[in-house]
């Protein structure tokens, strides 16, 4: 059992109907949902949830000029009754047109650009290295003749990878235990796009048509016929929602 964040997408809804609209969208995924003949199959995902985000870094940025709009969403208390203090210019949700996704992405884009520059500068002094995937595929095809331990040794034995892992400064440019060549793959623009796509989506997404997508699993797109990077999909989906549709962040327990 664990807690995680969910982004819920709703059709245009008046302020007084938001709580009921969220509850209706969430109902099919309740662990206690009772399957009815001809109705949706049981697909439990949660046993409790609450609106969440606008009192910390998980909230949606909103321009100060729009903060008086009554359609913006902020739940004033936690489930235990504790009062929440809203972070200025951050909300739990609201109409897509009022949520400034780019304001949230901007610092991440700047940091990604600097990481890209530093990595490219670092790699200039080394011969090109081969991504770990190449060694892993060779091991997969001939495990007896080329075991995984050998694949790892050959990958980490490359001068660039050895130097990168020996440099505390360079190690900070990419997540631990990842292949820096894979992390910085593609063009500068593609790298920044991947990094900024992590900002707005949560691990779980409930779409306008009622599809719960769990981005933490490998086959996240099975129900909707999609594959590839979940965050790129979810970020584009949220970006392109109609401006009057609501986007609300929840925390749920499963």
Residue ranges of predicted features:
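Acidic/proline-rich low-complexity IDRs
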Residues: 5, 9, 77, 159, ...
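Generic structural signal of hydrophobic/aromatic residues within well-ordered alpha-helices
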Residues: 18, 22-26, 135, 139, ...
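Low-complexity, serine/threonine/proline-enriched polar segments
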Residues: 37-201
């Amino acid at each position: 059992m664990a807690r995680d964040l969910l982004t819920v997408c709703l059709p245009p809804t008046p302020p007084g109907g938001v709580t009921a609209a969220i509850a209706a969208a969430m109902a099919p995924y309740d662990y206690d949902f009772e399957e009815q003949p001809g109705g949706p199959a049981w697909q439990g995902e949660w046993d409790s949830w609450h609106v969440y985000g606008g009192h910390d870094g998980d909230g949606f940025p909103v321009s100060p000029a729009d903060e008086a709009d009554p359609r913006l969403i902020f739940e004033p208390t936690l489930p235990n009754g504790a009062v929440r203090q809203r972070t200025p210019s951050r909300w739990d949700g609201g109409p897509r047109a009022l949520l400034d996704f780019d304001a949230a992405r901007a610092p991440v884009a700047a940091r990604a650009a600097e990481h890209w520059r530093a990595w490219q500068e670092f790699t200039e002094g080394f011969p090109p290295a081969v991504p770990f995937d190449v060694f892993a595929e060779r091991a997969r095809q001939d495990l007896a003749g080329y075991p995984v331990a050998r694949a790892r040794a050959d990958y980490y034995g490359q001068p660039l990878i050895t130097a990168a892992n020996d440099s505390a400064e360079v190690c900070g440019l990419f997540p631990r235990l990842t292949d820096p060549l894979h992390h910085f793959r593609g063009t500068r623009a593609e790298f920044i796009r991947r990094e900024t796509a992590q900002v707005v989506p949560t691990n779980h997404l409930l779409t306008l048509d009622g599809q719960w997508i769990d981005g933490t699993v490998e086959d996240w797109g099975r129900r909707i016929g999609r594959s590839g990077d979940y965050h790129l999909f979810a970020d584009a989906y949220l970006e392109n929602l109609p401006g009057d549709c609501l986007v609300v962040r929840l925390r749920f327990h499963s």
